[in-house]
């Protein structure tokens, strides 16, 4: 089996193993946006919140989409993934055609003037973060898998099935993991 930590890099999905029971990360799918010797940053893709972006963030009145829980770190910060790095200054390309961050005032203006559509952005409250060596230790414990990411996965609203589909896409023994009950004792 491949050492999955070795292939982890920005643009990869981080999939919680079935053994990871931490309520912050149980059956989560994260997009890794930064991964280096200092640590890692990612955003949980399958945890929409009950709040709409337009209700929670000023300046984004046109976004009638759910705000997402990006992770348990700095939950007073807002982050955005989008497909419009061509018009947003300071955006960092994570995978081809998918960007992280950029000038929020410019983003607000472009959304409110119709240049950017709500379907091209996803907002996150907080992020998932690991210090140097922390994520590697979690991989050694068997807490995580990796998979390739796509823009479609980031912008899907099929939250309930995202984890099982992403794990199943790895094939082989992962198909069994993807089909395992959330509470094995209830099997």
Curated annotation (Swiss-Prot):
An annotated GO cellular component: cytosol
Signal peptide: none
Annotated SUPFAM superfamilies: VC0467-like
InterPro entries xref list: AlgH-like
Entry similarity comment: Belongs to the UPF0301 (AlgH) family.
Name of the protein: UPF0301 protein CT0663
């Amino acid at each position: 089996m491949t050492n999955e930590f070795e292939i982890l890099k920005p643009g990869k999905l981080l999939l919680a193993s079935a053994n990871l029971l931490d309520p912050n990360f149980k059956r989560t799918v994260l997009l890794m946006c930064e991964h280096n010797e200092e640590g890692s940053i990612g955003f949980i893709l399958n945890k929409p919140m009950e709040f709409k972006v337009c209700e929670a963030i000023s300046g984004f009145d046109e976004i009638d989409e759910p705000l997402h829980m990006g992770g348990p770190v700095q939950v007073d910060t807002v982050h955005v993934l989008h497909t419009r790095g061509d018009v947003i200054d300071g955006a960092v390309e994570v995978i081809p055609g998918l960007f992280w961050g950029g000038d929020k005032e410019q983003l607000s203006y472009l959304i409110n003037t119709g240049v950017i559509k709500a379907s091209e952005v996803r907002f996150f409250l907080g992020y998932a973060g690991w210090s140097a060596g922390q994520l590697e230790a979690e991989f050694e414990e068997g807490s995580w898998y990796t998979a390739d990411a796509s823009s479609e996965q980031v912008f899907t609203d099929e939250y309930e099935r995202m984890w099982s589909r992403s794990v199943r896409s790895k094939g082989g023994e992962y198909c069994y993991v993807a089909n395992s009950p959330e509470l094995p004792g209830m099997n």
